[in-house]
Amino acid sequence: MKMNRIWLLLLTFSSAIHSPVQGESLVCKNALQDLSFLEHLLQVKYAPKTWKEQYLGWDLVQSSVSAQQKLRTQENPSTSFCQQVLADFIGGLNDFHAGVTFFAIESAYLPYTVQKSSDGRFYFVDIMTFSSEIRVGDELLEVDGAPVQDVLATLYGSNHKGTAAEESAALRTLFSRMASLGHKVPSGRTTLKIRRPFGTTREVRVKWRYVPEGVGDLATIAPSIRAPQLQKSMRSFFPKKDDAFHRSSSLFYSPMVPHFWAELRNHYATSGLKSGYNIGSTDGFLPVIGPVIWESEGLFRAYISSVTDGDGKSHKVGFLRIPTYSWQDMEDFDPSGPPPWEEFAKIIQVFSSNTEALIIDQTNNPGGSVLYLYALLSMLTDRPLELPKHRMILTQDEVVDALDWLTLLENVDTNVESRLALGDNMEGYTVDLQVAEYLKSFGRQVLNCWSKGDIELSTPIPLFGFEKIHPHPRVQYSKPICVLINEQDFSCADFFPVVLKDNDRALIVGTRTAGAGGFVFNVQFPNRTGIKTCSLTGSLAVREHGAFIENIGVEPHIDLPFTANDIRYKGYSEYLDKVKKLVCQLINNDGTIILAEDGSF
């Protein structure tokens, strides 16, 4: 391994000799400098680095050399080409948190959503145009003469493992490309081969909804760039730096969402593609589970339905959709109205009084705020819930944050003093002395790790010091819970089922989550390659028995994918019938599921 690294370094040096700086275009020079900065970021602050080396066989030096060669061997590269190389460089980490976004507006999409069934077929489940020869329930066979599976293979990132989450990401990209995410954007028409439900096949020509790039390419304007001229009498008008507070880019302040989420949200908004299949959709794509007895109005899709068990007995079951943990991104969120955790609390109080069990739909959830996640979990339990710990990459940035917490809470010794310092709640999680003590403990643990040099991948630390989620003082749902998950649950949406599963609080049903298992930090830096932001993972979450969430995801108790009939007819009847059967078992067997020898129920 050491000889391989030496060889790669020699190769890099040799490449530099044979590619003199003066022979490189301005665009290439800028991209190489930005690549070097990204490499430095990964070396210093990317927590899963060692894990990626073991799990993927990924190597930072080798990946960097490969990207350099791509940039140097392309004659007069365009900015978009360089952006694609940098996106692929970070994409090789196979990390849903890690990625670069760009200042670019070129995009293209086809107004269709496709979903894969349990038998490996691809069906159209949503048509977002008034005029189309394609219908819901049609099967997608080929794209431009190539089988769908082969086309998806070209959309995977390097070092992919072929997981369901990776395939879903490729499937999402199949009909939606954005230069802001480093995609190569198509235009014109493409040919889709489809099969109707009754068996006939046909080819349909469809046109990409294309938006051209409006940001001029640096490669085009480079010849016109002149060195700036300053008059001797010119005075400086640069504003003074405000040092009144510490503006942190540390791992403690960024939402836990995939790197593409902001760009995808913007794409949904600007293209008008409103669909229940969208990530973060308020309603989701599942139909109601039965006759509706009660229904909420507001930010959450929530209702009570009557469900009949195998003995003909009727049960009242609650259904609640949690679309996102980025509460400010909720589709109907009104900043002037009550916060979502207050509405959530009212819904849970109704469920506590009027249901025998609760189904939570958390499919297609992008993640979000960890404190908001804790707030919701605190209302779904009547006992403390143990939390995963985090192995962190620590820098002086995190040390200053730890000192800030300790200074803020230095003389806090009561519930009242805790609320004076922190407010009544932290994104819905009730503040008391225990919260203040957790935060102080967190600060002390960070400082202790720093003083011992335990900074590269620290001893596991509870995030924000929260060893446990404690029940909400007034709202505590204590009846059986069934949580529906899938491969498009990211980050906080990985942690929600982890906490409930590892504490035996809920039955987890569906398919394995995406596996974005750590905290996120974002970096912005001046550049001319059009990089808007770089998002990386700053910690590795560790479950109770030492298992990572990163890349692995959360395995459900009951694996339940969607069948072809579920998807083709858009009723998901087979899926929901099994879910209702499981919930009735939970109700009738005191929260226990009885499986047959073959795993059926």
Swiss-Prot record:
GO terms for biological process, alphabetical: proteolysis; signal transduction
Any one GO cellular component localisation term in the record: outer membrane-bounded periplasmic space
InterPro entries xrefs: ClpP/crotonase-like_dom_sf (IPR029045), CPAF_PDZ (IPR041126), PDZ_sf (IPR036034), Tail-specific_protease (IPR005151)
Gene Ontology molecular-function annotations: endopeptidase activity; serine-type peptidase activity
Transmembrane intervals: none
Pfam families: PDZ_4 (PF17816), Peptidase_S41 (PF03572)
Top-rank lineage group of the source organism: Bacteria
Family as reported in the entry's similarity comment: Belongs to the chlamydial CPn_1016/CT_858/TC_0248 family.
Protein name: Protein CT_858
